[in-house]
Amino acid sequence: MSFLKSFPPPGPTEGLRHQQPDTEAVLNGKGLGTGTLYIAESRLSWLDGSGLGFSLEYPTISLHAVSRDPNAYPQEHLYVMVNAKFGEESKELVADEEEDSDDDVEPISEFRFVPGDKSALEAMFTAMCECQALHPDPEDEDSDDYDGEEYDVEAHEQGQGDIPTFYTYEEGLSHLTAEGQATLERLEGMLSQSVSSQYNMAGVRTEDSIRDYEDGMEVDTTPTVAGQFEDADVDH
């Protein structure tokens, strides 16, 4: 296929974790031949006997797994999903994007690496996990960042910057607008009604239910209703 290129295999300088010879490469159901799979820290590469092959960058790999389902593929293999198109499909994708620029569907390619030695699959998968972990998704890292304003203690000690304002509960109430106070009262009423409804049986509030919620503590003293949840046999 046209995307196959000639390049030197990854070496020790690229953190080679696993090398698996006699491995067939399959792209979207089309066999590419048998060659050697190189799982390195820098990239995932496959080369056939003539020195032609391809490399996959870890940030483009969205999924990898060991597949043993004969319904998905007749042989056990290492499955790799990539967010990209290759070969003739990449040309078709470019043409489709020119016709419909509003299409947000992300391109997907499926690689299957079928080793001659099926016992090597676990080692291949482990090496993939270790190398993939070295290339975290930058979007995941950004989501962990704190978006709020940070109080600069050092700047405050130097007489710069504003001191953050903190309110007690009573002080906070005094800063509420009329609309805010009305909302707070409505929420408190809903909460009170919700607590009350939890301790009513058949719409009747009993004395036991009142005592069980004294001082804000729930105490389970409700008597068991005979026969309602019992599985024992009863003689008649």
Curated annotation (Swiss-Prot):
Residues recorded as bearing Phosphothreonine in the entry: T222
Keywords annotated in UniProt: Acetylation, Cytoplasm, Cytoskeleton, mRNA processing, mRNA splicing, Nucleus, Phosphoprotein
Assembly information from the UniProt record: Component of the methylosome, a 20S complex containing at least PRMT5/SKB1, WDR77/MEP50 and CLNS1A/pICln. May mediate SNRPD1 and SNRPD3 methylation. Forms a 6S pICln-Sm complex composed of CLNS1A/pICln, SNRPD1, SNRPD2, SNRPE, SNRPF and SNRPG; ring-like structure where CLNS1A/pICln mimics additional Sm proteins and which is unable to assemble into the core snRNP. Interacts with LSM10 and LSM11.
Record field: transmembrane: none
Main location: cytoplasm
Stated family: Belongs to the pICln (TC 1.A.47) family.
GO cellular component terms attached to this protein's record: cytoskeleton; cytosol; methylosome; nucleus; pICln-Sm protein complex; plasma membrane; spliceosomal complex
Lineage: Eukaryota, Metazoa, Chordata, Craniata, Vertebrata
The protein's role, per its UniProt record: Involved in both the assembly of spliceosomal snRNPs and the methylation of Sm proteins. Chaperone that regulates the assembly of spliceosomal U1, U2, U4 and U5 small nuclear ribonucleoproteins (snRNPs), the building blocks of the spliceosome, and thereby plays an important role in the splicing of cellular pre-mRNAs. Most spliceosomal snRNPs contain a common set of Sm proteins SNRPB, SNRPD1, SNRPD2, SNRPD3, SNRPE, SNRPF and SNRPG that assemble in a heptameric protein ring on the Sm site of the small nuclear RNA to form the core snRNP (Sm core).
Any single GO BP term: cell volume homeostasis
N-acetylserine found at: S2
Positions carrying Phosphoserine: S101, S143, S192, S194, S197, S209
Known tissue expression: Widely distributed but expressed more abundantly in nonpigmented ciliary epithelial cells than in pigmented ones.
Subcellular compartments: Cytoplasm, Cytosol; Nucleus; Cytoplasm, Cytoskeleton
Annotated region described as Disordered, given as residue ranges: 1-20
Name assigned to this protein: Methylosome subunit pICln
Biological source species: Oryctolagus cuniculus (Rabbit)
Coiled-coil boundaries: none
